[in-house]
């Protein structure tokens, strides 16, 4: 269930803060956004990507010099939606620190590796999975051929970025992403997808 679906069911906790001017209530995600914490929970799609991008841009406008924490628990999803998040992470001035909690797969793992170097983390029992781009073109043969060429170009683009972000040779990344490649948190650190496995706050 996505965070949006959970919100639709009215299951997102509310936080009430006291101030000299009275009480103010926030949903938990809005309150955490005040602390520069952004979540990607569930599938990466146009809706979740638009929310994440908007939050990153808002936090940059609030303070371009202060890091943003990006927590990821996602099975992946749309490549184009994920690349919108990736490009925004690289575009904005603040460093984006990434943290895997639970599971970061496919585009989720790609975005985990996209954090600022030295600021990519995983909790110890998280799982990370990388694989090649998935496609599902239908229609006339010529259209399928056009889509196949585009998918191969996208696959090559993502492998090159992943090789750059992890420090792994491109040929190794190509081989490893041919099929689902699961890693523990420690293996993800060794691979270069994260910089540190953390068990508690320093």
Curated annotation (Swiss-Prot):
Keywords in alphabetical order: Cytoplasm, Hydrolase, Protease, Serine protease
Highest taxon of source: Bacteria
Active site: residue positions: 106, 131
A Gene Ontology BP annotation from the UniProt entry: protein quality control for misfolded or incompletely synthesized proteins
Any one Gene Ontology cellular component term annotated for this protein: endopeptidase Clp complex
EC number(s) on file: 3.4.21.92
Keyword set includes Cytoplasm: yes
Keyword Protease: yes
InterPro entries reported in the protein's UniProt record: ClpP, ClpP/crotonase-like_dom_sf, ClpP/TepA, ClpP_Ser_AS
Residues spanning the membrane: none
Molecular function in Gene Ontology: ATP-dependent peptidase activity; ATPase binding; serine-type endopeptidase activity
Enzyme class: hydrolase
Catalytic activity: Hydrolysis of proteins to small peptides in the presence of ATP and magnesium. alpha-casein is the usual test substrate. In the absence of ATP, only oligopeptides shorter than five residues are hydrolyzed (such as succinyl-Leu-Tyr-|-NHMec, and Leu-Tyr-Leu-|-Tyr-Trp, in which cleavage of the -Tyr-|-Leu- and -Tyr-|-Trp bonds also occurs)
Location in or out of the cell: Cytoplasm
HAMAP family found in the cross-reference section: ClpP (MF_00444)
Family: Belongs to the peptidase S14 family.
General function of this protein: Cleaves peptides in various proteins in a process that requires ATP hydrolysis. Has a chymotrypsin-like activity. Plays a major role in the degradation of misfolded proteins.
Subunit description: Fourteen ClpP subunits assemble into 2 heptameric rings which stack back to back to give a disk-like structure with a central cavity, resembling the structure of eukaryotic proteasomes.
UniProt protein name: ATP-dependent Clp protease proteolytic subunit
Organism: Paracidovorax citrulli (strain AAC00-1)
């Amino acid at each position: 269930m996505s965070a949006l679906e959970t919100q639709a069911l009215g299951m997102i906790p509310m936080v009430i803060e006291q101030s000299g001017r009275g009480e103010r209530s926030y949903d938990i995600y809005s309150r955490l956004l005040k602390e520069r914490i952004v979540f990607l929970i569930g599938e990466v799609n146009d809706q979740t990507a638009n929310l994440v991008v908007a939050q990153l841009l808002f936090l940059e406008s609030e303070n371009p010099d202060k890091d943003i924490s990006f927590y990821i628990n996602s099975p992946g999803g749309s490549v184009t939606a994920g690349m919108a998040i990736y490009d925004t992470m690289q575009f904005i001035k603040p460093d984006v620190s990434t943290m895997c909690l639970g599971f970061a797969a496919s585009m989720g793992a790609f975005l985990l590796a996209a954090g600022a170097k030295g600021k990519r983390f995983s909790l110890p029992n998280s799982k990370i999975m990388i694989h090649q781009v998935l496609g599902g073109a239908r229609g006339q043969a010529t259209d399928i051929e056009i889509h196949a060429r585009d998918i191969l170009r996208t696959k090559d683009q993502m492998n090159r970025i992943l090789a750059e972000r992890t420090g792994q040779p491109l040929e190794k990344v190509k081989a490893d992403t041919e099929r689902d490649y699961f890693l523990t948190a420690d293996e993800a650190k060794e691979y270069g997808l994260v910089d540190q496995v953390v068990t508690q706050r320093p």
